């Protein structure tokens, strides 16, 4: 536009014609400007002006306009104006400018421009001419407008009209013509441009806010038009100039300020005049020069503003006010010699020389809560901030309301002209001015500028992020690649010996400028000044640029000349830890790992080195060892890691290396020395060993193992921190690898420890209680040693001895550490480690009680647990699992049979011991002891439980942890790999990681996958418990999905993964169940008990899943993190049972979740709380004992898949975050709660009630079951209504879970009828569950749906409920396990849908499966949704093979319903097995489908054959085969599942 206008002007358009042009054009051009002037077409020019310019008071308008328009149309016209101004400035008379302006404008133009110029003049006169221009412009405009546009003058807005292009044109002319107003010519001269100021003002007003750009640009034609501009009165012309400029031009109308003063005042814009006090009288020209001190009065700056303030564009939003140089205060001004209130004016001036408004920056008002009230005024196109100075403040003011605004280029051009805009200036000053009225009415103006302020973003401070070389010969000349930030021109790279000493040697490195880049450099190392050093010298590298020096000084080492021979050796040896001279050494020394590592490193020095490096440097090195380890997958590597712990340990480890027990033995040996020397360090050192071992077992794990090593070497907090970093790195790798292996557990463990730190503190206390006396521990251990002697005599002996010593040491150290460690996170980890060690010791002891296999494994696991807890239970479990799987696999089958018997007896012994220990340990024991209980339940289970114990101990302290324990105490066992990892350390943090990695980890084999899922689910549960947030639970679901997928279907991975994991969870439960009764343990643990034996068994029967499970269980037992246990999901079940059985549940209730049936019964006998806790896994056969503990509620929960999820959730939610978990577990919680103890049990009881009848409860305590059933029925009835609500919206399930735990109870509690009603109500919810999606959302509700079935299962007596229960029961166990997520309600894990539901989802509802699988709604429920009867069949589909071999085996061990609960993991009965059928051999092995024989009689079948049943050649496998075929048939009959499906459907 400006150019157009200029062309028009040059075309000698009459003022009128331009005006017409202007009005029309401006209207067209500046529709936005027609805000207020929409009415004035004639004022089109005015309309063109921005709204602010026109209607708002000039200063405001001007300011606003300016700020907005500075770059806009106003900007363009102003350039023209600027030119005019420039000419006028040269003329050095405003009048001249004015006249030129007027002259150039024809009358028409003038009218518009007059309006503008008037406005401008007014503006110039009053600092806020723009606004005041309205008045002035009204008058002037009226005249002018009359000349040009009658209508334009009619409105003050005419003034604004004037600003349109014409005005700009006129303005520039006017500036020239301004000569009429000689007054301002000088000032105008001073201003960058006289008209520019006026233009600026107006323009800024209109331009900033509007799209007046075009009009302004039109105005630009002003220069051309100038010649033709008519001259107006000085005032008028000034005003016009000012107005025109300011109207369309940039805000800053420099020139026209003074000239227009009169106009300004006369313009109705009194506001402006008075505002600024810049009336012609008051308001001096902004570009005028005024003294700082006069007549005894002085305006001085007390505090100067900051030297750099990044100005902002109007569109950027505020960057805040200008601060002082401390960044804590604001520039402060004081007026001395005057005691009357005055107005302080602040504007942005140029950076040097005579003060005048800045051409590129404007002041802007900053508003805030506590800022000083101020107002913006537009003077001569420049925004001025006015603040009151008051005597009350001693005439001192901290100016906290002034920011700096950067004008758009268009505004700048409009303001100072195109020529002026080329001279970029990024520095400005704040100019402070006061106008003091003398007694005679005259005004004294004082003005003082601040120091210059740089208004651009400063160059970033350089940083070095990474360098390619850490050490070099003293000769230098090697190239170093530096990666970093902000390497700008002028960068220097300095090598300095002592950075803090400026006089120390320093040298500038030569930079390769050809490859110089902003974020990377290549420099040559300068030679060191002393070429004859004999020891490495550490210097610092930093980068210096104009912006300063890099904050972080990178260490660099000059090594002696290679001639000395030290350099090369050092570099090579220390490559992984080049920081040998650095503080890492201390950490290493503290670790005492160097010597040990070397010894143990026999096989893998790299691994040793990595642990040694445990500092940041080690990080890199660790990664390599991890890779190596994964490749080698050899126990020596882990041993190497273990070596880090202690020389003795190394020896023990080496001896252990010979056999699978070696891992546990190294752990034990490691524990004892480290415990004595440094308990804190010991757990950490321990961890590395465990990790290493795990890595050996799982290829993926090796990556994790170094981290574990590092964490195990936590002895020094520095080392620990460094290792933690390493861990995290490994964690990432771990997860990837773990997805196929138990490595996942490791990474999760890493996170878990942090989450569990507080729990760890508690745990530290608990461990002492748990292990009340070393004597008892040693007794247990000796017993274990004897038992272990059977399976792993050699390794067991060393491991258990170490364990006993460790237990004693750990107890002592833990007590000490508990006091010390509790205070610090490091301490927490140490406590956790110690706790784990204790737990592991207990579990070891328990293992001794349990069959030799378990004891041996436990010994190894136990040893690891200490390591694992601090470092990562995960890796330990993985190690154990792998070791067990590889070494023990062969032994496992042989030993398993032997050990099964031993396990049964030892399990009973362990359970007894556990009970006694639990009782003695009290809360701490109950928390910590659940692992002991698990140990009793089964070796594998004990490790899992141990970690749950940790969780539990932690959980009791924090409710979240409690929930985790409850839900997860079993899940950790189940998780095996992941659970153990996540249980203690990472339970809370990576629920998803848990689940996902377990999937991958277990994914190695079908069995392994099932385990993974299991571990994932349980890990998630553990995580949830630990984290106390439900996030992990959500992950849990996915993991379950994977489990289910692995077992049955890919689709079920989403929702089914939950179910799948549910199956695995069942396995976990079976672990609980196992513990529950020696039988169940024996069967579950037969694979589990002999770690090697169980492993072989698991591996063969279960395939990877169970095989892993066994090792996992063992690992879990030893690790106490269910990491490996989880992979051996079914073992995990035993472990879970153990966990629940341990006293931990009593205190924490949540830990009880995984008590074995026996333990549950004991717990029930011992404590209702334990029962409740146990109830989590009690749900099915194993669960039933748990349920007995937790009452019928738990069973009900487990019986039905929904109950399972409820149970899981309730376990978590009840104990820890029932409310939080409620959403997820609410139905479970509610169910569990009602029957269970009033507190957690209210929530948990109903869930468990349902579960309990499911399996274990029935066999374990018929009376309890009946009671539970009754409670359930009552609760169901009560809750049915609630539950109907709950179920009414499956999502509500989560809601309900969070909102009401009792309603969830209802959900679970309801027996068949209540369940049916609830389910009916829920049907949509559960049906949705069937549609995996709702299940994902609710997860819990899904479990709830099958609850009626669960209730039926609970009460063998009630046939109707039982049949539904049967179907439900199968699925329910899975669900239950899944839900064992920690208190994280958020993730309310309805993870454990009944397998039937899962199968239904898979087979019947592939699509729903996806939706539902995440939720894993009860199998029955899902089938019910699908076809009422289908649920069992779908379940079968999910767990096709599960029902046959594995589950039967698991259940068979328990023989009784209790055992079934042990099988609970895959409590899918027939359906479950069908689900597993996908790979009958593999899936059953993996999932060990807990199909209870596949018949509605879940209880009868509840003695699910060992999870490994298929792989294992037990009667269970036969049953599983039958079940499988039955399941297949059922799958075919999915829609018409009768025995289970009918009831389920009815319930549904």
From Swiss-Prot:
PTM-bearing positions, type Phosphoserine: 137, 151, 172, 577
GO MF: chromatin binding; DNA binding; DNA-binding transcription activator activity, RNA polymerase II-specific; DNA-binding transcription factor activity, RNA polymerase II-specific; RNA polymerase II cis-regulatory region sequence-specific DNA binding; sequence-specific double-stranded DNA binding
Low complexity bias (residue ranges): 81-106, 196-209, 662-672, 751-765, 979-993, 1264-1283, 1334-1348
Modification(s) after translation: Phosphorylated. Phosphorylated at Thr-152 by CDK5 in response to osmotic stress; this phosphorylation mediates its rapid nuclear localization. Poly-ADP-ribosylated by PARP1 in response to DNA damage, promoting recruitment to sites of R-loop-associated DNA damage.
Keywords: Acetylation, Activator, ADP-ribosylation, Chromosome, Cytoplasm, DNA damage, DNA-binding, Isopeptide bond, Nucleus, Phosphoprotein, Transcription, Transcription regulation, Ubl conjugation
Cross-link (Glycyl lysine isopeptide (Lys-Gly) (interchain with G-Cter in SUMO1)) at residue(s): 572
Reported induction: Up-regulated under hypertonic conditions.
Classification via InterPro entries: Ig-like_fold, Ig_E-set, IPT_dom, NFAT, NFAT5_RHD_DNA-bd, p53-like_TF_DNA-bd_sf, RHD_dimer, RHD_DNA_bind_dom
Cellular component terms (Gene Ontology): chromosome; cytoplasm; cytosol; nucleoplasm; nucleus; transcription regulator complex
Tree of life domain: Eukaryota
Cross-link (Glycyl lysine isopeptide (Lys-Gly) (interchain with G-Cter in SUMO2)): 572, 619
Residue ranges flagged as DNA-binding region: 310-317
Main localization category: nucleus
An annotated GO BP: calcineurin-NFAT signaling cascade
Residue positions where Phosphothreonine is found in the record: 152
Domain RHD: 281-460
UniProt feature, compositional bias: Basic residues: 217-229
Residues that bear N6-acetyllysine: 139
Biased composition (Polar residues): 141-151, 258-277, 766-777, 851-860, 876-886, 1113-1127, 1284-1300, 1308-1333, 1349-1388
SUPFAM superfamilies the record matches: E set domains, p53-like transcription factors
Region feature Disordered, mapped onto this chain: 54-106, 141-180, 192-237, 258-282, 659-682, 750-777, 851-892, 970-1010, 1097-1127, 1257-1388
Cellular compartments annotated: Nucleus; Cytoplasm; Chromosome
The protein's role, per its UniProt record: Transcription factor involved, among others, in the transcriptional regulation of osmoprotective and inflammatory genes. Binds the DNA consensus sequence 5'-[ACT][AG]TGGAAA[CAT]A[TA][ATC][CA][ATG][GT][GAC][CG][CT]-3'. Mediates the transcriptional response to hypertonicity. Positively regulates the transcription of LCN2 and S100A4 genes; optimal transactivation of these genes requires the presence of DDX5/DDX17. Also involved in the DNA damage response by preventing formation of R-loops; R-loops are composed of a DNA:RNA hybrid and the associated non-template single-stranded DNA.
Quaternary state and interactors: Homodimer when bound to DNA, completely encircles its DNA target. Interacts with CIDEC; this interaction is direct and retains NFAT5 in the cytoplasm. Does not bind with Fos and Jun transcription factors. Interacts with DDX5 and DDX17; this interaction leads to DDX5/DDX17 recruitment to LNC2 and S100A4 promoters and NFAT5-mediated DDX5/DDX17-enhanced transactivation.
Identification of the protein by name: Nuclear factor of activated T-cells 5
Annotated source species: Rattus norvegicus
């Amino acid at each position: 536009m400006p150019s157009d206008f200029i062309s028009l002007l040059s075309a000698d358009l009459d003022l009128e014609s331009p005006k017409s042009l202007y009005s029309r054009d401006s209207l067209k051009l500046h529709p936005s400007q027609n805000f207020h002037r929409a009415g004035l077409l004639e004022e089109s020019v005015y309309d063109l002006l921005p709204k602010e310019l026109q209607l708002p008071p000039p200063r405001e308008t001007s300011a606003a306009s300016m700020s907005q328009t500075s770059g806009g149309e106003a900007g363009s016209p102003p350039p023209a104006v600027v030119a005019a101004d420039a000419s006028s400035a040269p003329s050095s008379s405003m009048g001249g400018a004015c006249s030129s302006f007027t002259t150039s404008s024809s009358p028409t133009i003038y009218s518009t421009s007059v309006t503008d110029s008037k406005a401008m003049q007014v503006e110039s006169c009053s600092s806020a001419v723009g606004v005041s221009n309205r008045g002035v412009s009204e008058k002037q405009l009226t005249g002018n407008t009359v000349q040009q546009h009658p209508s334009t003058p009619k409105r003050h807005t005419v003034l604004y009209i004037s600003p349109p292009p014409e005005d700009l044109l006129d303005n520039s002319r006017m500036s020239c013509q301004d000569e009429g107003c000689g007054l301002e010519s000088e000032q105008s001269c001073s201003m960058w441009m006289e008209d520019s100021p006026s233009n600026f003002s107006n323009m800024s007003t209109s331009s900033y806010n509007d799209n007046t750009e075009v009009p302004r640009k039109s105005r630009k034609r002003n220069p051309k038009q100038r010649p033709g501009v008519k001259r107006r009165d000085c005032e008028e012309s000034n005003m016009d100039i000012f107005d025109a400029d300011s109207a369309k031009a940039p805000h800053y109308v420099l020139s026209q300020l003074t000239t227009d003063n009169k106009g300004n005042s006369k313009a109705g814009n009194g506001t402006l005049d008075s505002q600024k006090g810049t009336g012609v009288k008051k308001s001096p020209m902004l570009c005028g020069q005024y003294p700082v001190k006069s007549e005894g009065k002085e305006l001085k700056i007390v505090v100067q503003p900051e030297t750099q303030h990044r100005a902002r564009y109007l569109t950027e939003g505020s960057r805040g006010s200008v601060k002082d140089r401390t960044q804590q205060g604001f520039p402060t001004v004081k007026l001395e010699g005057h005691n009357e209130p005055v107005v302080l004016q602040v504007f942005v001036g140029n950076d040097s020389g005579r003060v005048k408004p800045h051409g590129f920056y404007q002041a802007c008002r900053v508003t805030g809560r506590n800022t000083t009230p101020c107002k913006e005024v537009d003077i001569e196109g420049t925004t001025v901030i006015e603040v009151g100075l008051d005597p009350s403040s001693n005439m001192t003011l901290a100016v906290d309301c002034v920011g700096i605004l950067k004008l758009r280029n268009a505004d700048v051009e409009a303001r100072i002209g195109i020529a002026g805009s080329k001279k970029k200036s990024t520095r400005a000053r704040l100019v402070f001015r006061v106008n003091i009225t003398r007694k005679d009415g005259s005004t004294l103006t004082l003005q003082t500028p601040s120091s210059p302020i740089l208004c651009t973003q400063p160059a970033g401070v350089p940083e070095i992020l990474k360098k390619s070389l850490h050490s070099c010969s003293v000769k230098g000349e090697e190239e170093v690649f530096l990666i970093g930030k902000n390497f700008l021109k002028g960068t220097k790279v300095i090598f300095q010996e002592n950075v803090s000493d400026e006089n120390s040697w320093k040298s500038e490195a030569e930079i390769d400028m050809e490859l110089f880049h902003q974020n990377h450099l290549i420099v040559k190392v300068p030679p060191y000044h002393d070429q004859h050093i004999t020891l490495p010298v550490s210097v610092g590298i930093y980068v210096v640029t104009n912006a300063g020096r890099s904050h972080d000084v990178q260490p660099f080492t000059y090594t002696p000349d290679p001639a000395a021979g030290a350099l090369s050796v050092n570099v090579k040896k220390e490559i992984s830890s080049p920081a040998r001279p650095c503080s890492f050494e201390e950490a290493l020394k503290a670790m005492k790992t160097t010597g040990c590592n070397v010894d143990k490193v026999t096989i893998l020095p790299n691994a040793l080195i990595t642990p040694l490096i445990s500092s940041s440097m080690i990080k890199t090195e660790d990664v390599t060892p991890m890779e190596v380890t994964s490749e080698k997958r050899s126990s020596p590597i882990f041993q190497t890691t273990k070596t880090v712990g202690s020389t003795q340990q190394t020896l023990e480890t080496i001896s252990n290396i010979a056999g699978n027990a070696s891992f546990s033995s190294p752990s034990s040996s490691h524990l004892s020395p480290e415990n004595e020397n440094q308990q804190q360090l010991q757990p950490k050192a321990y961890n590395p060993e465990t990790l290493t071992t795990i890595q050996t077992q799982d290829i993926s794990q090796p990556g994790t193992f170094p981290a574990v090593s590092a964490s195990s070497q936590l002895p020094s907090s520095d080392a620990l921190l460094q290792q933690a970093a390493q861990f995290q790195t490994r964690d990432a790798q771990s997860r990837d690898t773990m997805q196929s292996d138990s490595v996942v557990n490791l990474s999760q463990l890493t996170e878990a420890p942090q989450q569990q730190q507080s729990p760890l503190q508690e745990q530290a206390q608990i461990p002492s209680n748990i292990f009340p006396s070393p004597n008892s521990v040693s007794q247990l251990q000796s017993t274990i040693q004897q038992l272990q002697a059977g399976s792993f005599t050699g390794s067991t002996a060393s491991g258990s001895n170490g364990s006993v010593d460790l237990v004693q040491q750990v107890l002592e150290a833990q007590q000490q550490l508990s006091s010390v460690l509790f205070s610090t996170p490091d301490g927490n980890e140490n406590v956790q480690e110690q706790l784990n060690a204790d737990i592991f010791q207990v579990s070891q002891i328990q293992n001794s009680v349990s069959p030799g296999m378990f004891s041996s494994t436990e010994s190894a696991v136990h040893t690891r647990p200490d390591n694992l807890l601090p470092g990562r239970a995960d890796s330990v479990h993985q190690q154990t699992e792998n070791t067990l799987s590889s070494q023990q696999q062969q032994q496992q089958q042989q030993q398993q049979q032997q050990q099964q018997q031993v396990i049964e007896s030892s399990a009973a012994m362990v359970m007894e011991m556990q009970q006694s220990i639990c009782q003695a340990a009290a809360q701490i024991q109950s928390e910590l002891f659940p692992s002991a209980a698990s140990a009793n339940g089964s070796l594998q289970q004990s490790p899992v439980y141990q970690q749950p114990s940790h969780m539990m101990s932690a959980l009791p302290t924090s409710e979240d942890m409690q929930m985790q324990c409850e839900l997860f105490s079993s899940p950790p066992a189940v998780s095996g790999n992941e659970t153990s990892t996540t249980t203690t350390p990472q339970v809370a943090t990576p629920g998803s990681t848990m689940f996902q990695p377990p999937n991958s980890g277990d994914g190695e084999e079908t069995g392994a996958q099932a385990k993974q899922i299991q571990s994932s689910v349980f890990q998630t549960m553990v995580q949830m418990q630990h984290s106390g947030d439900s996030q992990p639970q959500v992950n849990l679901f996915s993991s379950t999905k994977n489990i289910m997928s692995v077992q049955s279907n890919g689709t079920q991975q989403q929702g089914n993964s939950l179910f799948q994991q549910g199956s695995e969870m069942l396995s976990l439960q079976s672990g609980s169940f196992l513990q529950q009764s020696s039988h169940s343990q024996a069967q579950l643990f037969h694979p589990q008990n002999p770690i090697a034996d169980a492993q072989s068994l698991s591996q063969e029967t279960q395939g990877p899943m169970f095989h892993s499970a066994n090792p996992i269980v063992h690992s879990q037992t030893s690790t106490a993190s269910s990491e490996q246990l989880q992979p051996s999901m079914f073992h995990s079940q035993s472990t879970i049972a153990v966990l629940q059985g341990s006293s931990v549940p009593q205190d924490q209730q949540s830990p009880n979740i995984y008590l074995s049936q026996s333990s549950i019964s004991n717990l029930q006998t011992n404590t209702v709380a334990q029962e409740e806790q146990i109830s989590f896994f009690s749900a099915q056969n194993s669960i039933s004992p748990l349920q007995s503990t937790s009452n019928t509620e738990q069973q009900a929960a487990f019986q039905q898949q929904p109950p399972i999820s409820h149970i899981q959730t309730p376990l978590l939610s009840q104990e820890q975050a029932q409310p939080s978990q409620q959403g997820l577990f609410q139905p479970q919680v509610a169910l569990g709660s009602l029957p269970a103890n009033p507190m957690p049990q209210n929530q948990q009881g109903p869930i468990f009630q349902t579960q309990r009848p499911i399996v274990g409860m029935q066999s374990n305590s018929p009376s309890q079951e009946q009671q539970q059933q009754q409670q359930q029925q009552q609760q169901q009835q009560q809750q049915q209504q609630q539950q109907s609500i709950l179920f009414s919206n499956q999502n509500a399930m989560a809601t309900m879970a969070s909102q009401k735990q009792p309603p969830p109870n209802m959900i679970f509690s309801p027996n068949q009828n209540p369940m049916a009603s609830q389910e009916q109500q829920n049907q949509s919810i559960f049906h949705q569950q069937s549609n995996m999606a709702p299940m994902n959302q609710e997860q819990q509700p899904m479990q709830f749906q099958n609850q009626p079935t669960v209730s039926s299962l609970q009460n063998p007596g009630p046939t109707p409920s039982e049949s539904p229960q049967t179907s439900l029961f199968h699925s329910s166990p899975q669900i239950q396990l899944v839900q064992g997520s920690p208190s994280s309600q958020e993730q309310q894990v309805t993870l454990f849908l009944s397998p039937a539901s899962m199968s239904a989802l898979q087979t019947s509802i592939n699509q729903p499966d996806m939706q539902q699988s995440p939720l894993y709604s009860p199998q029955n429920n899902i089938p019910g949704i699908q076809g009422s009867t289908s649920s069992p069949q779908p379940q079968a589909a999910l767990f096709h093979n599960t029902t046959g071999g594995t589950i039967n085996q698991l259940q068979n061990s328990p023989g009784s319903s209790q055992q079934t609960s042990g099988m609970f993991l895959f409590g899918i009965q027939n359906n479950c097995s069908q689900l597993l059928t996908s790979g009958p051999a593999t899936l059953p092995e993996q999932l060990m489908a807990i199909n209870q024989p596949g018949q509605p009689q879940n209880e009868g079948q509840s003695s699910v054959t060992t999870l490994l049943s298929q792989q294992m050649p037990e009667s269970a496998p036969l049953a599983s085969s039958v079940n499988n075929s039955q399941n297949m048939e059922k799958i075919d009959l999915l829609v018409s599942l009768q025995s289970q499906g009918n009831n389920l459907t009815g319930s549904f």
